[in-house]
């Protein structure tokens, strides 16, 4: 497991600045948040087609990794299932292009029934996981929302039993929301924890 920070909420920084911050703070990587921002969209962006190779070279020169892409969608939102699938498939495509091993999924804190959440998430993962498996990318469900109770996340992960579907341990959510100790998280998730 590598120590990395997310670019979430840092909209006024360049990717070079993120790399400098990570290197200065002795982090091992950076997590990319929001594939719709300028870094991916604009022709001057660090990950636009022609700039991506140079950006990756700078990352490797600083001995950093891009740990994961953080999907914006809420996989539990069944009303947005089609848009969520498109976003996750795009995340997988970008991950392949940029040699990023993981795509993070995060269930929101919306007021939905547990069965609705499991149904929506299972349906979405079953549509995206085959592409991720084919491309060697892992989908990681964060320990947030309903899944801050890591026994529920284990139940979901067990239902797929795929090497390309694992857990992303959000320390604060599992501790403060789920009220779980690190020992309990590892007891429930074990080898499913990838990041």
What is the meaning of each model-derived region?
Residues 1-101, 126, 162, 191-193:
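N-terminal pre-domain/capping segments
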Residues 6-10, 33-37, 71-74, 108-110, ...:
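Active-site beta-loop-alpha junctions enriched in small/polar residues
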Residues 38-43, 75-79, 109-115, 175-179:
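A short acidic, helix-capping loop that chelates divalent metal ions and anchors anionic groups
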Residues 52-53, 122, 150:
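Short, surface-exposed alpha-helical segments at coil->helix boundaries
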Residues 95-115, 135-144:
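Active-site groove signature of glycoside hydrolases
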Residues 102, 126-195:
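Acidic/histidine-rich catalytic cores of soluble enzymes
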Residues 111-125:
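Active-site cleft segment of glycoside hydrolase catalytic domains centered on the general acid/base Glu
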């Amino acid at each position: 497991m590598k120590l990395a920070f997310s670019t979430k909420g840092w909209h006024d920084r360049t990717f070079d600045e993120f790399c400098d911050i990570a290197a200065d703070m002795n982090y091992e990587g950076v997590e990319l948040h929001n594939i719709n921002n300028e870094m991916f969209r604009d022709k001057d962006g660090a990950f636009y087609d022609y700039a991506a190779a140079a950006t990756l070279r700078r990352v490797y020169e600083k001995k950093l990794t891009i740990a994961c892409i953080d999907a914006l969608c809420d996989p539990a939102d069944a009303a947005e299932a089609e848009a969520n699938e498109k976003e996750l498939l795009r995340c997988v495509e970008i991950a392949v292009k940029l040699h990023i091993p993981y795509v993070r999924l995060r269930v929101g804190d919306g007021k939905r029934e547990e069965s609705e959440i499991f149904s929506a998430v299972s349906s979405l993962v079953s549509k995206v996981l085959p592409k991720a498996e084919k491309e060697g990318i892992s989908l990681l469900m964060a320990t947030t929302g309903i899944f801050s109770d890591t026994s529920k996340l284990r139940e979901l992960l067990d239902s797929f039993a795929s090497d390309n579907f694992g857990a992303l341990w959000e320390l604060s959510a599992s501790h403060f929301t789920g009220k779980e100790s690190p020992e309990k998280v590892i007891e429930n998730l074990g080898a499913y924890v990838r990041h």
